[in-house]
Each structure stands twice: as C-alpha cells, then as structure tokens.
A protein has these predicted regions:
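Small-molecule kinase domains that catalyze NTP-dependent phosphoryl transfer to phosphate-bearing small molecules
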Residues: 181-215
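Charged, amphipathic alpha-helical linker segments immediately N-terminal to NTP-binding catalytic cores
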Residues: 1-15
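Hydrophobic positions on the alpha1 helix immediately C-terminal to the Walker A/P-loop
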Residues: 70
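Conserved nucleotide-sensing/catalytic segment adjacent to the nucleotide-binding pocket
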Residues: 86, 92-140, 145
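P-loop (Walker A) phosphate-binding loop of NTP-binding proteins
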Residues: 62
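ATP-dependent NMP and nucleoside kinases share a basic, alpha-helical "lid"
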Residues: 134-179
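Conserved lysine of the Walker
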Residues: 67
Length: 215
C-alpha cells in the first residue's frame, strides 16, 4: 500500500502499479461519466462533454527512473479493460541532446490543443540523422486515453500527473544498459537540463497526483 508523501510531490506515494491503474481508471470514469441519481439516471447530461476528449496521463521523471516501463504496463492494463490507448514518447519530440526545454514547450502546446478538443501536430525528431523527421497529427476525437511519457510530461496539460523516482546510481545503470555507451557522454548534459526544468516548473511538479518509486 502507498503512503502520503511529505516530500517533493505532495501526492500519493506508491510502488504498486495496480494502485496507479486504479487511480487512472477512476479518473477516466469520473471525467467521462456524468453524475447520476440513486436510480442511475444522469443528473445533468449537459454538465460535461469530456467523454469526447481523451484522458491525458503524464508520466514524468528523470532519465532511467522507469517511466517507459510504467507507461508500457499502464498501456497493457488499460487496453485489457477495453480502453484504446495511445502512447506519446517525448524522446520522439526533443530536438536533440540540448532540446529538453524546447520539447517540453512543444508538448505543452500539443496538450493544450488536445484538452480543448483540437487536433495537434508535431514533428518527430530523427535521432540518427540529428534532424527533424516526419510530421504527425493527433486527433483527440479518435483517442480515448493518451499517455505522454518523458521528462517534462507533467509540465503539460494533464488529467493525471505521475512522477517516477529512483536512486541516481540505479538510474544511471538503467540508462546505460538501455541506450548503450552512446548515452554515457550525454548523461551530465541531459541531467543539467532536467534540473533546470524541474526548477522552472517546481510548482507544477509539486502537484503530482502520484509519486511512483521503482526502487
């Protein structure tokens, strides 16, 4: 079971993916289903139109913390409930190794449009060519749940904000194991951008709904 965190995040702290899934499902049903009377009849069918909008889940945290694994588990679990899920990895948006701030701003614009029911376009970053790649468009009318995973995710407009944490040494090992030696010279470079981002959006990160510790 989780405990209430008194540290960074001030949200519900847990290491149980099932608790996170339960929270996301309750939020999804709370947004899409109108309040009912004791007979189960809607009290005000015009109160909200959020059923036409996707639930946006932001999964944030420093490199190697376990964001990608959590997003995969949530995608699998929500899909098993019959819910259509789209995962957006911010790694595909950051414009290179110095692009964390710019990528976060791009995601903020995307998420604002989606939350208003408007289509949102972005250009994928081609890491091999170190250049902009193809353009993609997300149509909120065609999505039910969107999971945004990456550093800066909860700086966007999200219905659920999840902050993933792990010890620095473990994060480093995971990152190198995942990306290989090509990441090693960029570790400190990226970490400095993470620190700057967390400082710039400290109030937003303090409002995380859930803190998920992977170790």
């Amino acid at each position: 079971m989780g405990v209430w965190s008194i540290g960074f995040g001030n949200g519900y702290e847990t290491n149980d993916v099932e608790e996170i899934l339960e929270f996301c499902l309750k939020t999804y049903h709370g947004l899409t289903l109108p309040p009912t009377d004791e007979d189960g009849m809607p009290l005000d069918t015009n109160a909200r139109n959020d059923a036409a909008l996707p639930l946006i889940i932001g999964i944030d945290g420093r490199s190697g913390s376990g964001k990608t694994r959590l997003s995969g588990l949530l995608e699998q679990s929500l899909s098993a409930e019959g819910i259509c899920v789209r995962v957006l990895n911010l790694d595909s948006i950051y414009p290179g190794w110095d692009g964390l701030e710019e990528g976060t701003k791009t995601w903020q614009e995307i998420s604002r449009n989606l939350h208003k029911g408007k289509p949102a376009s972005y250009r994928e970053w081609d890491w091999h060519a170190d250049a902009p790649g193809p353009e993609h468009t997300i149509n909120p009318a065609q999505e039910i749940v969107i999971i945004c995973e990456g550093v800066g995710a909860i700086a966007g407009t999200c219905d659920v904000r999840i902050l993933v944490k792990a010890p620095n040494e473990l994060r480093y090992r995971r990152a190198i194991d995942r990306d290989g030696e090509t990441y090693r010279p960029h570790w400190e470079r990226w970490a400095a951008q993470e620190e700057a981002l967390f400082a710039a959006y400290s109030a937003t990160y303090a409002q995380a709904d859930i803190i998920y510790r992977t170790a």
